[in-house]
Amino acid sequence: MLEKEDIRSLLKELPSSPGVYRFYSIEKELIYVGKAKSLRKRVANYFTNKKNLDQKTRSMVRKIYHAEYTLVNSEYEALLLENNLIKENKPKYNVLLRDDKTYPFICLSSADFPTLTTTRKIDKKKGEYFGPYTSGRAMHSLVESLRKTFFIRTCDLNLTKQNIDAHKFKVCLEYHIGNCKGPCEGKQEKEDYDVSIIQVRNILKGNFSSVKKYYQEKMLSAAEDMQFEKAQFFKERYNSVLGLEKSSLIVNPDINNLEVYTIVKRLNRASVNFMSILHGSIIKARTIEMKAVLDETEEELLMHALFEIHEEGWDSTKEIICNIELPILSTYCKVSIPQRGDKKKLIDLSLKNAWHTLTRYDDQKKEKPEIRVLKTLQADLSLKELPAHIECFDNSNIQGTNPVAAMVCYKNGKPSKKDYRHFNIKTVEGPNDFASMYEIVYRRYKRMGEEGLPFPTLIIIDGGKGQLSFACQALKDLNIYGQIPIVSIAKNLEELFFPGDNDPLYLDKKSESLKLIQQIRDETHRFAITFHRQKRSKDALLKTEFENLVGIGPGTVKKLLTHFKTVKRIKEASIEQLTPVIGNSKATILFQQLNK
C-alpha cells in the first residue's frame, strides 16, 4: 500500500480537473481504472475516508502501490476514456467495484446458428463476448437492431443439422412478421446465416459503417416508397446506432489505427505523451519522463520514447500524428503535424498531459534527497512499504573473546543515534556468529514486542546466508516472520540475500540504494567495533587492577562494575557503600586491600 508520505505527495500533485486515474499493484498490474470530475477530490476519498469504504474497496486500496492519471477536457470525456481503458485492460477491481454491479455484455453464442443475448456473467465456453457496455438501454437497442437487420434468431432451439433434417421444429411468429428467415425448418441455409454473423461480429468490434449505411439506404428507400412509418422506424434504429457509436468514442469515429505523440522540453528534462486511437476510441495512454544527458534534441528524445513503447516494431501502426517533425518514421507509416480539426484536438489533449507531467517535476525536485533514496531502495528491493525505519545488526569478537554485537537505526534515511543499541552476548560460548545473530535479533524484537514499540520497516543483517537464516529463525520463534522485510549484505562482493532465495541480488555499484545500505552496514560495524574495544579495554583494566586482590573473584568484580560503572568509583567507595553490593565481609577485604 502507498505510504502516507506517498499519498500526500500524490494528492498534492493531482489537479482539480477532470481525468482518469489508474491504480497499479506492486507487480505493476493495472488493478483499477476510475473517472473523476476532480481528480484530487476523487482519489483523496480512497485514502482519507477509509471508514466509509466497503470491504472490497478497502482490499483494493491495500494493494495500491503506484498511481497514474490522464487529464481530459470534461467529465464526459473522462467517462468515455475510462470505459475504453476498462474494455482494453480489464482491470481486476473494476469488475468488483463498479458500484457493486457488473456491467452487461453482448454474447454471440457458439451454436451452429449463433444467437445474440445480453448477460452480466461471462462463460467463454458459451460464446464470444463484447463489452462491457455502460448504457444498458443502448446495448439492448443495438441487439434488437442487429437481430432485425440481419435476421438473427431469438429462440434457443438446438438447431443442429440432424434436428433440422428430422423436422423437429416449426417456425414461430418471428418468421411470420419478417424478423427471422426460419433456419429451424431449413428455410435459411447455414452459409447465408454465417454471412450475417460475420457482419454482426464486425459491428460489435466497432465497425459501425456497414450498419449505418444499411439503415440510411432502408430509410431513403422507405421514404421514396411513401412508407413513412417504416422510414421513421429505420431512422430511429439509425439514431440508436449513432448513439451507441458516440458512447464508445472520445474522438471522431473516422479516426482509426492512429497514434498520438507529443513532447515538451524544459532545459534538460522532457515529457513525452502517447495515446493510441482505435475506431475513434482512446484505448491506451501513457506519459514518459526523460532527461537529456548529452543535450539531445526533441526529435532524438521522442524517438527514444517511441522505441521503448514499440518494442516489437511498427508493423501495426498506420498513422502517427505529432507536434514535431519525425522524418525518420516517414518510411514506416504516415506522419503528420495536424493544424486543425479533430486530430489537432488530440494533439492539444496530449500536450496538456505532457506539460502537466513536466511541470510536476518542479515540485518533485524539492523532495528531500533522503526520501528520494529511500524510494529508490524501496523499488530496488521490491518492498511494499517505504523503508523509513531501518535497523542493521553486526557481531564483533576476536577468537571468541569479549563477544558483543551492535544495532544501529536509521529513520527517514538518517542515523537515529538515540536508538542505537549494543549487546553483550549471553547465551553463546566461543566464536559462533550464527548463534550470536540469533540471540541479538531475538532479544531486540522480543523486547520491542513487550514494550509495544513499532517494528522497523526493514532489517539488514551484516553477513551472508548463514547469518540471515539464523536471524529469520529468531523472527519465526517470535511469530513475526514475514511482518518485517529482512535482507543480508555479504562482504567483498556486496551481495544482497533474501530469505528463501539462493540467488543474490547485485545492485549497481553506483546506485544510491547500495550506497545507503553500505553506509548503514559500515556504521553498524563501526559501532560494534567501538563497543568491542571499550569492552576489551575495560576488561583489561579490571584484570590489571583486581587480579592480585585476595578473596575478590571475577563475579564480585562484575557486580561492582555493574553498580559503580568505573574502577575509579570503586576505589573511592566506602565500606558502607560497598557492603550492599558485595556483602560486609568482601567489602571489608576489598576496602583494606585498595587502601593499603
Swiss-Prot record:
KW Cytoplasm (keyword) present: yes
InterPro entries cross-referenced by the UniProt entry: GIY-YIG_endonuc, GIY-YIG_endonuc_sf, GIY-YIG_UvrC_Cho, RuvA_2-like, UVR_dom_sf, UvrABC_protein_C, UvrC, UvrC_RNase_H_dom
Ranges of residues in domain UVR: 209-244
GO molecular function annotation: DNA binding; excinuclease ABC activity
Record keywords: Cytoplasm, DNA damage, DNA excision, DNA repair, Excision nuclease, SOS response
Cell location: Cytoplasm
Domain GIY-YIG: 16-95
One Gene Ontology CC term in the entry: cytoplasm
GO annotation, biological process: nucleotide-excision repair; SOS response
Cross-referenced SUPFAM superfamilies: C-terminal UvrC-binding domain of UvrB, GIY-YIG endonuclease, RuvA domain 2-like
Keyword Transport: no
Chief localisation class: cytoplasm
Alphabetized Pfam families for the sequence: GIY-YIG, UvrC_RNaseH, UvrC_RNaseH_dom
Function (record text): The UvrABC repair system catalyzes the recognition and processing of DNA lesions. UvrC both incises the 5' and 3' sides of the lesion. The N-terminal half is responsible for the 3' incision and the C-terminal half is responsible for the 5' incision.
Family classification: Belongs to the UvrC family.
Assembly information from the UniProt record: Interacts with UvrB in an incision complex.
Protein name: UvrABC system protein C
